[in-house]
Amino acid sequence: MKKTLLFGAISAILANVAIADELDPLSAAQRHQQAYEYREQQANINYNNSPALHLNNGDEANVPNYAGQFHKTLPHAANGTVNSAAYQQLLTAIQAGSFTAFEQVPAGGPVKLANPLAAQVYDLEGRDSHDYGMKPAPALGSAEAAAEMVEVYAQALLRDVPFSEYTSNANVMKAANALAILTDFTGPTSAELLFRGIFEGDQTGPYISQFLYKDIPAGPKVVDQKYTRYKAGENFMTTPSEWLAIENGQMPSKSVNTQTARYMLTGRDLSRYVHQDYTYQAYQNAALILLSWGPSVWDDGNPYKTATRQGAFIDLGAAEILDTVAKAGNAALRAAWFQKWNVHRRLRPEEYGGLAQNNPGLLHAQFNSSIVLNHVQAKYGNKLLPMGYPEGAPTHPAYPAGHASISGACVTVLKAFFKEDATIPSPVQPSANGSALEPIADVLTIGGELNKLASNISLGRDWAGVHYRSDGTEGMLLGEEVGIAILKDWRDAHPQAPALTLKKFDGQEIQI
């Protein structure tokens, strides 16, 4: 009996010590309950935002032989027409949404489809990937699609012209004139601003964002942004046999040649960067650069900016900013993958180029009569799109661009955490040969250069010939919505109730 009483007394003492050691506004049970209620609340908030109505451009039903759709890696006839039964089996697999169904899709070669089942993954932060909406992609025979392809062909012809020479290069001026006469072109048409984005900051200062030129403080090492470049003048898929093999899913028979590293000077340089970057690389680098500039460039809604006894780190500091950038990027990819595979299935520019060669009657007259198409015909003996990569486009549909969707999400996160109207310290541009950086007098803002970074990464894919302008513009807007949704969930989890602000791509200022 005495022994039992003794152990009971010891247990009571230990219990009291445990309670005394737990310095927390809530008991463990209360915290456990509130964590559940928070998650339930956020789920309800996101659930009450009704899912979008998903509509495509109708080409799949209205254009013969699925000519307006993505069908790379499926079997094709000699003229590039996809095997209809194989395409219908792809549609069956998409509808089924199962691993087994995709394994049964007929193949024209060993190259695999790029992860179509990713469209079915659920999200635990922000809204579900299927909730976000997009407008339909430009229809195959439309004037807008024609204008976009004229631009992509012009970029293919001008890959090696330095951005700094645009106002003096005769071929750039011809391309600008060719785009200016198109009725539905949505990009800039002056030689100075050719192939730039359309958002605030895109058309100010050098073509390339400061966040792709500035040194990166990567932990104990400072990394410059000189990158090896692809050999000038080297293009791919310019013969019908090479083009058809790639469309069937054969491995490329050629490879790229690289040259000495330099700062980016040309469209080809930019296309090389977005060929081998990891998903959120450019935005992680931008975050590291911004963090190195200190609290003066933090958003004014960050309470730690003026705190005297507390510093930001795990929340509202480097750890959380870097994590949120990566998190937003992957969520944006899932949203893009749903739109690509389950809604639009838009053909890639190289497939459009195949139609230019084999079935031009399906295309708009403004494309078929363009001077840029004549230049390609004269140079290569056919109308196929000269590609920047040996393998051409990735094996997933064009609309929206994955790179652009990541851009929109990650840049939105960065614009929330940092002060957009703060100026970039000591702006630079590359020397004529790209070996060094030189100071410039332009007044550039963080927000403008982040927008430009997003557009650079998006348009860099166009420079390679793997995307159209609207893939990028609309992809960035999709990514922006993903980023905002994640930030709203993030905000409600914080005891400080931070009130960060950002300016959307359309210029609207919002508070998270």
Identify the meaning behind each predicted range.
Residues M1-A20:
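Gram-negative bacterial Sec-dependent N-terminal signal peptides
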Residues D21-R469, T473-I512:
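Hydrophobic alpha-helical bundle signature of multipass membrane enzymes
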